[in-house]
Curated annotation (Swiss-Prot):
Family matches, as NCBIfam families: ATP_synt_delta (TIGR01145), PRK05758.2-1 (NF004401)
Location of the protein in the cell: Cell membrane
Source species, domain of life: Bacteria
InterPro entries on file: ATP_synth_OSCP/delta_N_sf (IPR026015), ATPase_OSCP/dsu (IPR000711)
Function text: F(1)F(0) ATP synthase produces ATP from ADP in the presence of a proton or sodium gradient. F-type ATPases consist of two structural domains, F(1) containing the extramembraneous catalytic core and F(0) containing the membrane proton channel, linked together by a central stalk and a peripheral stalk. During catalysis, ATP synthesis in the catalytic domain of F(1) is coupled via a rotary mechanism of the central stalk subunits to proton translocation.
Protein name: ATP synthase subunit delta
Lineage: Bacteria, Bacillati, Bacillota, Bacilli, Lactobacillales
PANTHER family: ATP SYNTHASE DELTA CHAIN
Family indicated by similarity: Belongs to the ATPase delta chain family.
GO cellular component terms attached to this protein's record: plasma membrane; proton-transporting ATP synthase complex
Keyword Nucleotidyltransferase among UniProt keywords: no
Subunit structure: F-type ATPases have 2 components, F(1) - the catalytic core - and F(0) - the membrane proton channel. F(1) has five subunits: alpha(3), beta(3), gamma(1), delta(1), epsilon(1). F(0) has three main subunits: a(1), b(2) and c(10-14). The alpha and beta chains form an alternating ring which encloses part of the gamma chain. F(1) is attached to F(0) by a central stalk formed by the gamma and epsilon chains, while a peripheral stalk is formed by the delta and b chains.
Topology of the protein relative to the lipid bilayer: Peripheral membrane protein
The UniProt record lists the keyword Transmembrane: no
Length: 178
């Protein structure tokens, strides 16, 4: 992806988030974006929209199907994308919208990797740790299970990491012995 394309994607995303923020609809916009991204991930919609073999009329039909359950702002955004023939960048734009929402609302996705699935109490404690240590609000809590950690957990938020895993501690101990 070129710098020009990246700038275009970011500008579309920033504009959509700005409009939603002005109208106090960030939560609605975020729900719409997550629903559409889920559709992208369960289908090959991204390939269809970026393919030159698929006629523009077919792309219009595909995006019209996405408009049914969305807010006015998302529907206007999708129409603008169609009007300017930027469908090929829609997936990246939606990802950028989520990033912009996170920046504006200071609410980031939290990835927690542990050796066992977390209980509800542990999840709430993770949210508290994130709020205290990173000074951000926890958005979605993405839970991963990795038995190789042996114990402890790894919390990752906005490119910052807390690693209390036994595996890392054993590696550090091994390095100290050398």
């Amino acid at each position: 992806m070129t710098k020009k394309e990246q700038a275009l994607i970011e500008q579309y995303a920033k504009s959509l988030v700005e409009v939603a923020s002005e109208h106090h609809s960030l939560d609605t916009l975020q729900a719409d974006v997550l629903a559409i991204l889920e559709t992208f991930e369960t289908t090959n919609l991204d390939q269809s929209l970026s393919s030159l073999a698929v006629p523009h009329a077919e792309k219009i039909k595909l995006l019209t199907l996405l408009e049914r359950n969305n807010s006015v702002y998302m529907n206007n955004f999708l129409n603008l994308i169609l009007q300017n023939e930027r469908e090929a960048y829609l997936y990246q734009m939606l990802q950028a919208v989520l990033n912009e929402i996170a920046i504006v609302s200071n609410q980031y996705n939290v990835t927690v990797t542990s050796s066992l699935p977390l209980t509800e109490e542990q999840k709430s404690r993770v949210r508290a740790v994130v709020a205290k240590k990173f000074a951000v609000t926890a958005g979605r809590l993405i839970e991963k299970v990795d038995p190789s950690l042996i114990g402890g957990f790894i919390i990752s938020v906005n490119n910052k990491v807390i690693d209390t895993s036994i595996r890392r501690q054993l590696q550090a101990f091994k390095m100290n012995l050398k």
